[in-house]
Regions:
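Acidic, proline/glycine-rich low-complexity IDRs
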Residues: 73-135
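Residue-level recognition of well-ordered beta-strand positions that form the cores
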Residues: 6-10, 70, 84
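Short beta-strand elements
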Residues: 46-50, 124-126
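Broad, structure-driven detector of short, well-ordered beta-strand segments within folded domains
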Residues: 65-75
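Ser/Thr-rich, low-complexity intrinsically disordered terminal regions
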Residues: 49-66
Length: 135
């Protein structure tokens, strides 16, 4: 499954004081706002964005299981970023059932890539292998 995407961009600089909301040296709020807008334009319902210690989360409405995209700069860089889709496994468990995640995750991955490619604001888009993502 395509769940981890890295790229380079100067379009998403840190907000002043952003490192007070998440870990120092990490940022991505502008990127999260950009993605939220892009996903809305692609027909997804965005529930909101939120700060986490590792970066920013863009929550996507999905009735079957929690669905979100994490995004952050690579630690100590100003223009290198990674986005990742959760869940990143082909199935999630809910009570006693096993729910397939692949179709909706792939739809979101396709939209994520399209938002970036159509914007012209990023370069070096690269999907990471499962081994690289776990790295």
């Amino acid at each position: 499954m395509r769940t981890h995407l890295e790229f380079t961009s100067t379009a998403f600089p840190a907000y002043p004081g952003e490192d007070k909301e998440i870990n120092p040296g990490i940022f991505g709020k502008r990127l999260a706002e950009f993605l939220a807008d892009g996903f809305r334009k692609k027909g997804f319902t965005v529930l909101g964005i939120g700060a986490e210690d590792w970066g920013w989360m863009v929550e996507i409405e999905n009735r079957e299981f929690p669905l979100w995209i994490g995004c952050a700069s690579y630690d100590g860089t100003e223009n290198e970023f990674q986005c990742f889709i959760e869940p990143s496994k082909p199935y999630v468990r809910k009570w006693f059932s096993k729910i397939e995640t692949g179709p909706i995750v792939e739809k979101l991955a396709t939209a994520l890539e399209a938002v970036f490619l159509q914007s012209g604001k990023v370069s070096g888009l690269r999907w990471l292998s499962d081994d690289e993502a776990r790295g």
